[in-house]
C-alpha cells in the first residue's frame, strides 16, 4: 500500500522492488487481482491506481496559439546527439493550461533522466513564460544544452531564454506532438495530481512542487526502475533506456 500511495503502478512497484534486491514472489498481475478483490469487498485501494486517460487543456485554438515566431530555429537543425539521448541537459518544454484558461504551468523535462522542472507562470504571455523557464533552469545552467518547444506564441521570447541560459532553443514542426513525446507524456502524469478541470490559479506553488517531487522520485521502467532524481544527479549507470 505504501507504493500505491506514492502513485506507483503495480508494474513499477514490482520493478522497483527487484531493482532494490528485495525477494519477490508475486507479479504485478497479482497486485492488480488483490486490488480488485479489495474493491469487491468495499475497499478503496482501487482509487490509488493511476487513471488510464489523461488530457491537456490548452488556451485558444491551434491557429491562435501558433504563428510566425521570429528567428525560430527548426528541430531539423538540432544536433543529432540530442536524439541519441546520451547526455543530461537536452530539455523538452511545454505549458499546461487550467480550467477556463485559469492559470499556466510551465513544464520542462530532461530527455535522458525524465527529471521534471515545473512552475506557475505569472501569465500566459510570452515574456512571463520565458522568465519562468529562465528561473527554473538557471541553477542548472551549466548542465543545459538545448530546449525544444512547440510553436505556441507563449515561446515567442525564445531568444531571451537562449541568451540568459546560454542554450540553443529549437522548435518542433507544427502539429508534430510526437517530436516532444516525453513532455506530452509528463504533462499527462502531472494531470494525475491536477485533473482536467483544475483551476491552476488556485493551485499553490508548494502544491505543484510536491507533485513534481513525487514524479521525480517515482521509479520508471525505462530507467531500469531508477528514479528521474537518481539519474539526473547521478548520471552514468548503464541501464538507462534510449527509447
Q: What is the meaning of each model-derived region?
A:
Residues 1-24, 78:
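A short, amphipathic alpha-helix used for macromolecular contacts
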Residues 149-151, 156-161, 171-192, 201-213:
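RNase H-like two-metal-ion nuclease catalytic core shared by retroviral integrases
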Residues 196-243:
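C-terminal domain-tail junction helix/linker
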Amino acid at each position: 500500500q505504501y507504493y500505491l500511495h506514492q502513485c506507483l503502478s503495480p508494474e513499477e512497484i514490482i520493478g522497483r522492488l527487484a531493482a532494490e534486491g528485495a525477494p519477490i514472489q508475486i507479479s504485478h498481475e497479482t497486485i492488480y487481482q488483490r486490488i480488485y478483490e479489495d474493491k469487491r469487498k468495499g475497499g478503496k485501494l482501487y482509487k490509488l491506481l493511476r487513471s488510464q486517460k489523461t488530457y491537456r487543456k490548452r488556451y485558444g485554438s491551434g491557429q491562435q496559439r501558433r504563428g510566425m515566431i521570429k528567428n525560430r530555429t527548426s528541430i531539423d537543425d538540432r544536433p543529432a546527439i540530442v536524439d541519441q539521448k546520451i547526455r543530461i541537459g537536452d530539455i523538452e518544454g511545454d505549458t499546461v493550461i487550467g480550467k477556463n484558461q485559469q492559470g499556466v504551468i510551465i513544464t520542462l523535462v530532461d530527455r535522458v533522466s525524465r527529471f521534471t522542472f515545473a512552475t506557475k507562470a505569472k501569465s500566459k504571455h510570452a515574456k512571463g513564460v520565458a522568465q519562468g523557464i529562465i528561473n527554473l533552469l538557471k541553477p542548472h545552467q551549466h548542465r543545459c544544452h538545448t530546449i525544444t518547444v512547440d510553436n505556441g506564441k507563449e515561446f515567442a521570447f525564445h531568444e531571451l531564454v537562449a541568451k540568459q541560459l546560454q542554450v540553443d532553443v529549437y522548435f518542433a514542426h507544427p502539429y508534430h506532438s510526437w517530436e516532444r513525446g516525453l513532455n506530452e507524456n509528463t504533462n499527462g502524469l502531472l494531470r494525475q495530481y491536477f485533473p482536467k478541470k483544475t483551476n491552476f490559479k488556485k493551485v499553490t506553488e508548494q502544491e505543484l512542487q510536491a507533485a513534481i517531487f513525487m514524479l521525480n522520485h517515482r521509479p520508471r521502467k525505462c530507467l531500469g526502475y531508477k528514479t528521474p532524481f537518481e539519474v539526473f544527479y547521478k548520471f552514468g549507470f548503464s541501464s538507462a533506456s534510449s527509447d
